[in-house]
Amino acid sequence: MPRSRTNGNFIDKTFSIVADILLRVIPTTSGEKEAFTYYRDGMSAQSEGNYAEALQNYYEAMRLEIDPYDRSYILYNIGLIHTSNGEHTKALEYYFRALERNPFLPQAFNNMAVICHYRGEQAIQQGDSEIAEAWFDQAAEYWKQAIALTPGNYIEAHNWLKITRRFE
């Protein structure tokens, strides 16, 4: 039985019911339906902190999903898991792959910026201001892209860009 059918969370159950209805109404292939089921189960496991199970579901969804736009969200969620696990290099790779398929994911740009900013802070703690500035400059570029896609969002990043004179 798919995970989404056994989940006790009200929101997840509601999402599952709506998704099942949409899958019946919207013309989709069996492969697309199966890919979505794995994606949905991955989101459910991820929301509960079951990252290994979520990754298994996402990898299976990636194997089945052919639409680049849908694949971008799978890749983005894999990036989120790697970020949560502190695997920043892997996370950056998955965010980048998501953006290759869908360049309109401001949240991926934001997460990449946060990782770069964090690495800049680490470099400062290690006494390497030159490396820190390079990381901060990269964070600024990613934040500018996120802000350009969704003006009015990422207020803290926007303020940081102004304060550090990185906003043009």
UniProtKB/Swiss-Prot annotation:
TPR repeats lie at residues 35-68, 72-105, 120-153. InterPro entries: PSI_Ycf3_assembly, TPR-like_helical_dom_sf, TPR_rpt, Ycf3/AcsC/BcsC/TPR_MFPF. Its main location: plastid. One of its GO terms (biological process) is photosystem I assembly. Disulfide bonds: none annotated. It is found in: Plastid, Chloroplast thylakoid membrane. It comes from the Eukaryota. Keywords: Chloroplast, Membrane, Photosynthesis, Plastid, Repeat, Thylakoid, TPR repeat. SUPFAM superfamilies: TPR-like. One of its GO terms (cellular component) is chloroplast thylakoid membrane. SMART domains: TPR. It is a peripheral membrane protein. Essential for the assembly of the photosystem I (PSI) complex. May act as a chaperone-like factor to guide the assembly of the PSI subunits. Belongs to the Ycf3 family. This is Photosystem I assembly protein Ycf3. It comes from Solanum tuberosum. The lineage of its organism: Eukaryota, Viridiplantae, Streptophyta, Embryophyta, Tracheophyta.
